[in-house]
C-alpha cells in the first residue's frame, strides 16, 4: 500500500502581479562632460570602432578560409589578450574598460545574426566619422546635484553632469549609451527595466475613430477620421537662411578639398622623381583648418535640422497614438522610393536632378520614422497599427470609388471626374487610406488579434503589447524613479 504524502499548494502571487512583465525603456539626456572626459569619450568611441572592425575582419577571414564561424563568446574572451598585445596594449589597455569593448563585439554579433535571419544586409565596416558611441553595461549610478541637473557615474569616466529633464522609469538601470554627434554635443541614454502589467481592457469595435494618415512632400501629414476630424500638419525643417548658409558652406568645403587634392597630386608626382634620385619623399597635405571649420559648421546645421525632424516626428506620432485607437498608413517603401536615379553606364537614368530633389524632400519629412514611431506608440497604448497597399490612394474618390488621375487637379485640389466630389487632395487620400484599411481589416482578420500581413493585405500589430507600456494606456503600474533613491 502506497504511503500518502502531504502536498502543500504553491503560494499564489499577489493579484496585482499576476500579469506583471518586465519592460525596458530608454531616456536620452544631454551631457556636459569636463575637458578630460570629452577626450576620453572620443578615445572610448574610437577604440570600440577599432575592435568592431577587427572582429569583422576576423569573421570574414574565417569564413573565407572555410573555418568554423567565430562566435561572440570566442571573440569576447580574446579581448584580454588583445589588450595585453604589445602592438595595441600601449593605448588599448588604458581605455576603455573591457566590458565596453565586449559590448561593441555584441553589437557586431547582433548585426551578423540579423543578416543570417534575412532581416538586413551584410554587416559593413564602421567608418571613421564624427560620430562616437559606446555602451557601459554595468555599475551605472545617479546622484542629484540640483533640481535640473544630475550626475551619472560611468566606468572609466567617473561622474558626469547631465540635464535631467525627465525622470527615468523603473528602479534598475541596465546600461548607459554615450553618443557624441558630429557637432560635438554629447548625449547619454539610460536603459531602465521596470515591471508592468499587460493591458486588460478590450479593444472596442469603434471604427469611426480610426484615422487614415497620408504622408506628403508639401504637407508632411494629413490625418482624417470618421468623426469629421481632419488635420494638415507640417513643419519646416530648414529655414531659408539656413539652406543658403548650408549651400555656401558646402561649396566652400568642396573648393578647399579640390585645392588640397590638386596639391597632393603634384606632391605625388614630385615624390616619384625624388624616389628615382634617392631623396626622401615629401609629406602630403592634410585637411586645412578652414576646411575642418567648414565641416564643423555643416555638422552643426545638420544636427539642428535632425533634432527638429525628430521633435516633429515624436509630437505627431504621440498625438496619433493617443487620439486614435486605430491608425492606417500606406505601405510606402521609403528606401526604394529615395533611391538614386543615376542608373548605370549601359542604362543611364533620367531627370536625375529632379529625382534627387524629391529624395531630399521625402527624407526631410521623415516618412519612415513617422510610421515607425507611431506604430510603436500605438502598440504601447494597446491600439492597432494598420498598413495597406499604396497604389491609387491619391486618385481614388472616397464617395463613388472612381479612379482617375485627372481627378487630381493640382497638388492640393481633388475633384472627382465622375461624381464631382471635391476635397483637399491630401485629406482625400487620407480618407481613401482609412476606408481601405477598414475594408481589408474586416475582410482579412479579426481586428482584435495580432496579425502580420503581407503586401496584399493589412498589417495589424495587436492590441496586447508585449514589450513596452506607456502613459495613457491605463494599464501601467507606478514605477519608482531611479533617482529618488539616490536623492
Residue ranges and their predicted role:
Residues 4, 17-20, 24-28, 39, ...:
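Positively charged, helix-rich recognition surfaces that bind polyanionic ligands
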Residues 56-59, 63, 112, 116-123, ...:
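Long, hydrophobic, amphipathic alpha-helical segments used as structural scaffolds
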Residues 48, 52-59, 112-119, 219, ...:
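A generic secondary-structure signal for well-formed alpha-helical elements
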Residues 55, 104-115, 427-436:
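Stable alpha-helical structural segments in soluble proteins, enriched in small hydrophobic residues
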Residues 1-101:
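Gly/serine-rich nucleotide phosphate-binding loop at the start of the catalytic core
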Residues 9, 132-147, 167-168, 210-213, ...:
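Short linear motifs in intrinsically disordered
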Residues 72-181, 343, 360, 364:
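Acidic carboxylate diad motif detector
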Amino acid at each position: 500500500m502506497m504511503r500518502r504524502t502531504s502536498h502543500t499548494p504553491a503560494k499564489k502571487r499577489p493579484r496585482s502581479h499576476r500579469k506583471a512583465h518586465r519592460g525596458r525603456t530608454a531616456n536620452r539626456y544631454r551631457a556636459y562632460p569636463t575637458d578630460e572626459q570629452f577626450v576620453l569619450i572620443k578615445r572610448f568611441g574610437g577604440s570600440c570602432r577599432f575592435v568592431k572592425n577587427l572582429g569583422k575582419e576576423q569573421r570574414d577571414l574565417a569564413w573565407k578560409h572555410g573555418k568554423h564561424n567565430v562566435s561572440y563568446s570566442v571573440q569576447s574572451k580574446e579581448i584580454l589578450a588583445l589588450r595585453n598585445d604589445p602592438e595595441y596594449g600601449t593605448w588599448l589597455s588604458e581605455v576603455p574598460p573591457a566590458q565596453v569593448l565586449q559590448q561593441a563585439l555584441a553589437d557586431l554579433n547582433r548585426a551578423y545574426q540579423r543578416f543570417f535571419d534575412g532581416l538586413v544586409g551584410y554587416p559593413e565596416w564602421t567608418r571613421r566619422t564624427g560620430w562616437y558611441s559606446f555602451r557601459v553595461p554595468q555599475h551605472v549610478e545617479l546622484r542629484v546635484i540640483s533640481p535640473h541637473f544630475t550626475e551619472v557615474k560611468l566606468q572609466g569616466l567617473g561622474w558626469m553632469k547631465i540635464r535631467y529633464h525627465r525622470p527615468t522609469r523603473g528602479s534598475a538601470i541596465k546600461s548607459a549609451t554615450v553618443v557624441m554627434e558630429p557637432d560635438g554635443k554629447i548625449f547619454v541614454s539610460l536603459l531602465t527595466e521596470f515591471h508592468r502589467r499587460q493591458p486588460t481592457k478590450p479593444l472596442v469595435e469603434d471604427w469611426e475613430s480610426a484615422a487614415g494618415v497620408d504622408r506628403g512632400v508639401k504637407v508632411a501629414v494629413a490625418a482624417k477620421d470618421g468623426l469629421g476630424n481632419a488635420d494638415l500638419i507640417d513643419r519646416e525643417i530648414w529655414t531659408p537662411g539656413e539652406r543658403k548658409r548650408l549651400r555656401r558652406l558646402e561649396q566652400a568645403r568642396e573648393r578647399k578639398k579640390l585645392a588640397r587634392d590638386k596639391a597632393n597630386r603634384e606632391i605625388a608626382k614630385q615624390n616619384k622623381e625624388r624616389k628615382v634620385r634617392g631623396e626622401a619623399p615629401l609629406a602630403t597635405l592634410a585637411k586645412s583648418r578652414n576646411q575642418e571649420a567648414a565641416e564643423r559648421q555643416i555638422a552643426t546645421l545638420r544636427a539642428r535640422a535632425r533634432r527638429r525632424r525628430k521633435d516633429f516626428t515624436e509630437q505627431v506620432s504621440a498625438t496619433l497614438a493617443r487620439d486614435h485607437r486605430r491608425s492606417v498608413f500606406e505601405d510606402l517603401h521609403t528606401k526604394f522610393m529615395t533611391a538614386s536615379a543615376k542608373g548605370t553606364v549601359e542604362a543611364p537614368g533620367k531627370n536625375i536632378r529632379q529625382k534627387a530633389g524629391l529624395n531630399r524632400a521625402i527624407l526631410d519629412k521623415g516618412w519612415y520614422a513617422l510610421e515607425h514611431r507611431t506604430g510603436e506608440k500605438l502598440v504601447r497604448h494597446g491600439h492597432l497599427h494598420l498598413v495597406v497597399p499604396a497604389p491609387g490612394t491619391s486618385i481614388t474618390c472616397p464617395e463613388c470609388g472612381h479612379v482617375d488621375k485627372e481627378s487630381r487637379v493640382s497638388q492640393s485640389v481633388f475633384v472627382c471626374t465622375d461624381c464631382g466630389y471635391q476635397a483637399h487632395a491630401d485629406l482625400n487620400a487620407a480618407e481613401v487610406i482609412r476606408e481601405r484599411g477598414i475594408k481589408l481589416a474586416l475582410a482579412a482578420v479579426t481586428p482584435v488579434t495580432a496579425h502580420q500581413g503581407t503586401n496584399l493585405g493589412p498589417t495589424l500589430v495587436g492590441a496586447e503589447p508585449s514589450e513596452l507600456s506607456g502613459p495613457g494606456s491605463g494599464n501601467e503600474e507606478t514605477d519608482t524613479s531611479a533617482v529618488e533613491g539616490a536623492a
